[in-house]
């Protein structure tokens, strides 16, 4: 029998993030960086300062981007467990830091999909010997994890497998042909997270979208290190117990860190009492753009690291460097910037599509000239939106899951077109957005401005689990680095060993629901066989290019044919046959191909109202 004595402890309250990590983190620790919309970036910078070159950490985090690049550059990470390595703004793209990941540089890496990663945390949090997932089966992710998961990646020589399978494929005990996987629980030593506020007892308020939610806090063997925007009186939490997501019993120590998620965002907390409100802030797009540009070269990366990590020396100095004007500009209103347009059934059963007028964005941005030529990416988005509209109206899908990139723009545009026809189809995003109504002028999928305009704010499990894997009427919309004639998708690793970005939630979507895939066509993207199967293509219904739509007439494994044709312009092939031959490596027939209607000015205007800066041109 185990006995316990003594009063319940309260977490330590320390002065700042540097004191927090230096007192409670030791080299060799397994640290988990919690994946919510407000990531613990101030603590990540502190880890880089305090443990540069000597951390030898195992780090688990579902996405490796933004401030995590600083921890990579510090040399403090020995092994990484993740789902994505790259950049997400202004567009999803590889980051040079991870180019040689297949060779074990800058660390060994264990790769998962977003839902299976979260299911591992759930298993760890609830004391289960395994988690269960329907993701990963049939992909190169499965093959790597079944071999031990510590490396090497296909085509490389980095790392040494630890011999313990992280994923074991299982047959359905009821005798169906469906297979699933048992996954090893994820149990870090410490979970680091950033919250909106906490009391001195350690009760932490998180504001949705929740991402992975509280699972990592419960899974951590030693507990949680937390930074918060503000430490509030106990009475505040006692009056709002429904807002507490992490109980104080799980918290080892905490500190205040205003703007602790910068350059990412935090949704504010309105209490009805102005003195107790927690002010939210938007993603700092200027900072994120500067970061991506700086890390494009080795010298630029060193200079950025010196300027923003080493020289400030503390979070307080980091905030002073940002300056009050910049901080004020990032302030997020608790309400939508502009009201939702009322949705009423159209009088005309087949009204012409008209562009929704742009509404006030957070920062006014110049709009492109209306006669600017339509780019290949824009044509891909528009044809993708048309494909989505047709699939929804003909096949009865009731939900769209938007992946990041051209795919989420196509989903947004399709939802707008359907809305004008009196059909409401909610658009979801993997971190917890449901029923998004995007703010014109903000093209970033995970913007807090879109959260403010959503019907529900939930988490990864609710969206990728409940709304995708558990919903037979969801249509996934994905982008691809490579896509082959079987529909297999690669967003991970090229044949020459260069790293792309990884799965994120794409594998979870492709293995559980019907999908459309969007990509501008070239022989480099439309390949005979992908170099790495990030997402199996059995459930891909269509692949949309800038010159037409490839469609399967049969089920999984049936061949694609070019079903529609939109001449790609004066500089492109003149016939469907020439386009397939010159712009793909697919053996796709073109018989029965029908003309695609010309791109309209209304379609282009609507798309550019979302993307006035032309990131997707």
Predicted regions located by residue number:
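A generic "binding-loop/recognition-motif" signal
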Residues: 64, 210, 406
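Structure-specific endonuclease nuclease cores
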Residues: 376-380
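N-terminal low-complexity or amphipathic/hydrophobic leaders
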Residues: 24-27, 31-33, 37-57, 383-430
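Short acidic loop-to-helix transition motifs that present clustered carboxylates
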Residues: 64-66, 433-434
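Polybasic, low-complexity association/targeting segments
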Residues: 425-442
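Conserved phosphate- and dinucleotide-binding cores of soluble alpha/beta proteins
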Residues: 2-23, 35-50, 67-371, 382, ...
